[in-house]
Amino acid sequence: MLKDNQKHNESVAPNSAFLSELQRALPEFFTADRYNEQGELIAKGGFDLARFERALKARNIDELTSGYQIDFIGKDYAKKQAGEKSVTVIVPDVEHNTLAENKNSHNLFLTGDNLDVLRHLQNNYADTVDMIYIDPPYNTGSDGFVYPDHFEYSDRALQDMFGLNDTELARLKSIQGKSTHSAWLSFMYPRLFLARKLLKDTGFIFISIDDNEYANLKLMMDEIFGEGGFVTNVMWKRKKEISNDSDNVSIQGEYILVYAKTGQGALRLEPLSKEYIQKSYKEPTEQFPEGKWRPVPLTVSKGLSGGGYTYKITTPNGTVHERLWAYPEASYQKLVADNLVYFGKDNGGIPQRVMYAHHSKGQPTTNYWDNVASNKEGKKEILDLFGDNVFDTPKPTALLKKIIKLAIDKDGVVLDFFAGSGTTAHAVMALNEEDGGQRTFILCTIDQALSNNTIAKKAGYNTIDEISRERITRVAAKIRANNPATNSDLGFKHYRFATPTQQTLDDLDSFDIATGHFINTSGQLAAFTESGFTDMINPFSARGLGVPGGASGEETLLTTWLVADGYKMDIDVQTVDFSGYCARYVDNTRLYLIDERWGTEQTRDLLNHIGTHQLPVQTIVIYGYSFDLESIRELEIGLKQLDQKVNLVKRY
């Protein structure tokens, strides 16, 4: 599969990801692929622009002849990245995931480059995430951000891909290792493009940012999410005190940009604030003792659509009012019976409905948050958990709680692919404990090494992701200590996204699918000369990839394949024995054969299981490196003789 992904990436153009999105939304305007008699692809289908223009004209839809878009050095390369597939593998942290508190958890912590992680998640989490929150690098010049891509293609390949001359190539490569605006935009573009595809149609994304890149981010988000996707720009007061951090203005706030994937979602109402209740509601009275209340007009204007109801109302003091009322007469009488009508101080005024504060559905949020929490609270939370300031700029959980409650219900999925100190996970777990919710989180951060002079390094942490995971563990322990009977999901599954060694990639490249042999550069049969392993499974073990966690090569390959095939990380995997060979079975339909030692006896046993309906199977996926050609042919012939269709997929 890695070879397939590498080959796919070579053909990806800057517009490939866009065309894929367009085809999903408007398949009727794409021509079909064309194949020859041997079933080989000879011409790939494409977008039929003429047909699309005819459809627009037929529906009297005017084209926009002008518009504005953001442009920057590296944009075409960033677009190409958005369409590429990952060439990393997913390594389960078996030692962690099998612990009692984690084995049944639906929370995920993903360690790796978030671009690779987002590419993988396209397969199994597209259109399923309820909200995304990210706190990316602000590109302040002192936050450590530099463009990380090393341009895996040669100069000639880059020139051919994007039609660059020597000067343009030099400009593109100038962003490498830099912190320019173009470098930051090139870094963020593919990540935000892929993130949008993960959201449900009702989903929202919240992005923390400051003045350094706000203007550029707004334009880029307008391009990726559409101008109509813009919801608001929140100003969050992150610092309460005035400081001398500038000669001109003391910076106290930063922004939270909010976008919706489509117009189908709506932010939740917030509970009425104490200040609003104090200002707008009356104190309880003998007549209305249930709590603070306010009178609301029962009349409607004649101009309102939907009309109203005309009838006479006689007040307690005998005054008669005839108006256009908002409620039918029977509904009004019900309000009177429930003591929810106010007739004024003299009991003769125009009747008004009594609304109690505790009956209110809430109020919309504002775009200025000056009383949520500050960065000081975020730092104090870290200090309380760790006993030291192991993270410099953590967001406070109160801020994330507010965002989460605005965006999703109690059972939503929250994604944060710049996880940092793990505040998002902390907020999710705390909210679930407070209101009995079943929200789940997906966190991702890179295993960036910590500098030797940092407090975290001196405290024993080696990488940023270790701090994030330790915070989740400590928060969970604190919740359990406060409530031993809690039913909240306080664990998480951990996976690392790793790149195979160059030696392993060289071995993969040397395999000749047609003959089933490894061929050296001289065209001669070769053993595994590069990776040092005697098979093509163990190089993908945790040991072979140089990461902890104890995963076998089979577990890594299976996890990677399951994600590629659209299965969630928590899919139940069963083991089926075929004459001593352990196969993996999922979804009551799909069988994975990864290990070596498959032969005639196993094929016979498998065909018997399927043919006698002991095991329903629709698809069998085999690891081509573990099978000789004769075993594959024998399996293909046997499957064709069954009275049901079973697909055989060979992966390399």
Curated annotation (Swiss-Prot):
Reaction equation(s) it catalyzes: a 2'-deoxyadenosine in DNA + S-adenosyl-L-methionine = an N(6)-methyl-2'-deoxyadenosine in DNA + S-adenosyl-L-homocysteine + H(+)
UniProt record, GO biological process: DNA restriction-modification system; methylation
Gene Ontology terms for molecular function: DNA binding; methyltransferase activity; N-methyltransferase activity; site-specific DNA-methyltransferase (adenine-specific) activity
Keyword hit for Secreted: no
Annotated S-S bridges: none
Enzyme class: transferase
EC number: 2.1.1.72
Its job: DNA restriction requires both the Res and Mod subunits.
Subunit and partners: Homodimer, also forms a functional restriction-competent complex with Res.
Name by which UniProt lists this protein: Type III restriction-modification enzyme StyLTI Mod subunit
